[in-house]
């Protein structure tokens, strides 16, 4: 399994002058680190804008400077070369692009000065058969796994979920793995566990929360609420078939603040960019 990358993720200097932010650099670094940590093969595409306009260039939309026969000819040539590589290596799992780019955008692109348009940039649009993810989606690699951990069955399920998420190249923080799984502890241990869990919540990209049972675990509910208030996406896992109301699977405040999934397949589909590594 390998990924095709837009080259500016590794070399931000290829981008137009002045558009790359510190947040962009952090996302680029997180993506590269994720792939290196899990041994994911990274193949980098050439940059059509740099080849056509040069490295030191001001920002411009497609219609302003790229809508020319010469640029289309360049894209034709680049596509042939990339298709040849794919014929040798096999189809990549996905392309990692950079939204807003007129050539390498995934969900949005600058086609004209009137504003960003929905859809891929003109270069990535030549590969509709290959899934594409924006670099920010791939950078969301840290998961806080919240759930009850009081019984052997609960802890076993949590471990299974953590292993499942790690098999898609996610860095999973599981509280029970740092000692939050025993009733025999003093107040100092309570404070240490709370502080470590809170720090992990502060630095996570996603919260995955187990909400099985007649009522969701109170600690898990707190963690979900904290994440939601911080703007962190929450994905809930409820395999319990019981309902708490006519149309509610669980308390409506939890249900409305999360994407609720009911099995591992639905959980995988709800993740922003699962990368299979096992």
Language model segments and positions:
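Short Gly/Thr/Asp-enriched flexible loops that form oxyanion-binding sites at enzyme active sites
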Residues: 102-127, 219-228
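Conserved catalytic or regulatory cores that recognize and/or transform ribose-phosphate-containing ligands
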Residues: 137-278
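Short connector loops at secondary-structure junctions
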Residues: 40-59, 137-139, 173-181
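N-terminal glycine-rich phosphate/adenylate-binding segment common to multiple enzyme folds
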Residues: 82-113
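Divalent-metal-activated hydrolytic enzyme cores
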Residues: 52-86, 116-140
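Short glycine-rich His-centered loop
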Residues: 9-21, 103-105
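Short catalytic helix/loop segments, enriched in acidic residues and glycine
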Residues: 21-39, 161-166
């Amino acid at each position: 399994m390998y990924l095709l990358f837009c080259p500016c993720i590794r070399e931000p200097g290829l981008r137009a002058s002045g558009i790359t932010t510190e947040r962009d650099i952090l996302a680029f670094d997180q993506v590269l680190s994720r792939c290196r940590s899990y041994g994911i093969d990274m193949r980098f595409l050439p940059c059509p804008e740099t080849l056509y306009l040069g490295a030191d260039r001001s920002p411009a939309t497609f219609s302003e400077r790229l809508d020319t026969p010469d640029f289309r000819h360049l894209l034709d040539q680049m596509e042939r070369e990339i298709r040849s590589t794919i014929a040798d290596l096999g189809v990549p799992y996905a392309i990692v692009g950079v939204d807003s780019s007129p050539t390498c955008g995934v969900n949005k692109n600058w086609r004209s000065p009137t504003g960003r348009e929905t859809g891929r940039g003109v270069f990535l649009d030549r590969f509709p058969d290959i899934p594409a993810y924006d670099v920010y989606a791939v950078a969301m690699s840290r998961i806080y796994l919240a759930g009850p951990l009081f019984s052997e069955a609960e802890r076993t399920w949590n471990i299974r979920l953590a292993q499942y998420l790690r098999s898609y190249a996610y860095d999973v923080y599981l509280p029970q793995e740092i000692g939050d799984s025993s009733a025999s502890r003093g107040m100092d241990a309570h404070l240490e566990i709370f502080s470590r869990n809170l720090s992990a919540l502060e630095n996570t990209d996603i919260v995955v929360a187990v909400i099985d049972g007649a009522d969701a675990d109170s600690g898990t509910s707190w963690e979900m609420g904290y994440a939601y208030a911080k703007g962190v996406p929450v994905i809930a896992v409820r395999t319990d078939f019981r309902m708490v109301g006519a149309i509610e699977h669980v308390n409506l405040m939890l249900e409305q603040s999360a994407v609720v999934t009911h099995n591992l397949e639905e959980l995988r589909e709800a993740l922003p960019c699962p990368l299979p590594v096992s």
